[in-house]
Amino acid sequence: MSVDPPAGAEGVLPLLAPMLAVIGPPPGPEAEAEYAYETLWNGARVIAHLPGDGGLRLLSQTGMDVTAQYPELHSLASLLPGGQAVLDGEIVTLDENGRPAVERLQQRMSLHQPDAVTHAREDLPVQLMLYDILYLGEPVIQLPYTARRDLLDDLALAGPGTSVPAAWPALAAQALQHSLAEGYDGVVAKRLTSPYLPGRRTRDWIKIKHMRPDKR
């Protein structure tokens, strides 16, 4: 599923809607090894377009251009000079303990005026957590998750304002334990053999939330 390009867009890179996860329990013991497990960020989903000319365009889950709202993320383009890529990830605002702070992110997302955005870069800085790749010189959505993840890791895109968080292949219990200990809300299980399915919600991606006694 693709989204309509914004007015004036040249459409050099494919405009793809993000793949979506279902909410459910962890895969059973017989299927646990068929998935990798990633941190559940509860951030603002974005598709990052790197056309290879030093520019960057960030599209929200609904296809809105939100690039101007997050100027501190523009340095991502310098990490892939001359390369064309489309990346999937989430924008988060972290608290003093390095954990996602949803309220702080909502404050940041509400800002649109340049002066307000500039001021918020200090008080409400954001981080882009990258976890998938859709295009690298050519479409790669048909590749299995493991191959796409290898491509993403090889790009070494960690830098100011960007991270490529680790995945836990076939280690559901460890991933859930780590997530709970670090104060995250859960993990996302991603089937190792699954292609990237733009705009579709399937059990290839399963959002697994912690059941805490204080959250009923």
Feature-to-residue mapping (PLM):
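Catalytic cores of nucleic-acid ligases and guanylyltransferases
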Residues: 1-216
